[in-house]
């Protein structure tokens, strides 16, 4: 990690031999009961068990067929498709503007990031320049949702390893952020905020101050979660050195986002190909060294810290101004114009009935979502609806790598590994 | 066609009256007990699951209704909460889970996808889980706010209180046509 936090700190009062006393278990080996010289093997038989799809640890939508020898996973097959909702096909049946609700429900833990990703793709195709303030608002809401996403992951991961308190704290912090999002865009979870050419509405009165207060509270809760988990013996024993992926393997498997960075590759699209206003903001990209579940957890904690920093900077930098382009071929005209002028009525009618006319062509646009690279491949034939829309879901390569990551480990290691890759049904199944 | 016997008063003996009275008492007390000890099986598939997490957490705390304590085994649960979209591949699994639950059991459809398919009007999605299992309470919203779900739980509790409960139910168990294993 970039900062010496977590298990690295040495506490003289810690139990000798524990991670807190600065004695890390040897790296690079999977420690098992069977490794010692007192190993007394029990006769174990080969068996195939079926985990899920309706199993709490498989998040309800993944089926894993695991071939076990005793407790060791020999082979695993994943069966997905239990949440296939026809995302790409549905998007081709509606106008460009009506795609937004579908994108909300891709990664439903951080919906605004999907909104922004799609809006950027369409704007790239239409060569639209969006107003400054809209860019800042998009970054602010995206980063708020990144914090929500990571809080959910950390909470759920801890809960599935037995730490209910962390889950309750995480959800409490997420709820505070959701309240602010509800004030901003009317929905708690599927917050539909980005529009083609800008954002839906400006911040309400006093929203900035409220959000800053909430962020302070979230920082406090996050620190508390860190105190509960970072040196927690149970948590460390189950996460450290389990589900390891080397840097080469991670690149080979197509990892992006926190999972790739946990393996040591400092690749972040916000730095590599900055979009919106990320090039003007000062923030760090945390990088892990071990590529195991514990690093992926620490990565999430550090990214929340960085997102917090980004939001505060945005609030300082942003200036009043337009929040959506004033081009009525793309954005709905303001209501006084709709009710008062014939041009306004016509623009409104055309946009609602036919949708915006995006110039013919195709484009691939990618953003850094909470899980990694969220890519939209958009093809337009010049009509009011997408001709073809393809999605590169960030969670998919990590899920596909799960059999590789868990081969040879214990069955119980499957749970933290599955949690730390943050598999979200909505985006993986599309 | 009305027969002349129709107008005659129904004669109930005092024994039957007493039995009915006692059965009513038993039914009421069983209903009271059952409505405050709902054990949920959360069948969580999609977005609504995030709201389910909130509802089960500290702020909304569904446990305070004596209800909705999550059980991750269908055999220990009597309220099936179907949270999120159910598609054609998932449908037989949902049906299997419902069949595995012990009687008496109730079902809540959490969110519009479970209630009606929501805006996923396409080949993949089941247009409402009531096409495959019976549903007692529908909670609208995409996703519903936790308050709406709590409202749904209270509605269900009212419904359970007013149902007739028996200590020993000798009725044959309902059979779902075309279910797995038949």
From Swiss-Prot, chain A:
The keyword Cell membrane applies. Keywords: Cell inner membrane, Cell membrane, Membrane, NAD, Quinone, Translocase, Transport, Ubiquinone. One of its GO terms (cellular component) is plasma membrane. Its EC number is 7.1.1.-. It comes from the Bacteria. It is a peripheral membrane protein. SUPFAM superfamilies: HydB/Nqo4-like. InterPro entries: NADH_Q_OxRdtase_suD, NDH1_su_D/H, NiFe-Hase_large. Residues 1-36 are annotated as: Disordered. It catalyses: a quinone + NADH + 5 H(+)(in) = a quinol + NAD(+) + 4 H(+)(out). Its main location: membrane. It is an enzyme of class 7 (translocase). It is found in: Cell inner membrane. GO terms for molecular function: NAD binding; NADH:ubiquinone reductase (non-electrogenic) activity; quinone binding. NDH-1 is composed of 14 different subunits. Subunits NuoB, C, D, E, F, and G constitute the peripheral sector of the complex. This is NADH-quinone oxidoreductase subunit D 1. It comes from Anaeromyxobacter dehalogenans (strain 2CP-C).
UniProtKB/Swiss-Prot annotation, chain B:
GO terms for cellular component: plasma membrane; respiratory chain complex I. The keyword Transcription regulation does not apply. Keywords: 4Fe-4S, Cell inner membrane, Cell membrane, Iron, Iron-sulfur, Membrane, Metal-binding, NAD, Quinone, Translocase, Transport, Ubiquinone. Its main location: membrane. Pfam families: Oxidored_q6 (PF01058). Belongs to the complex I 20 kDa subunit family. This is NADH-quinone oxidoreductase subunit B 1.
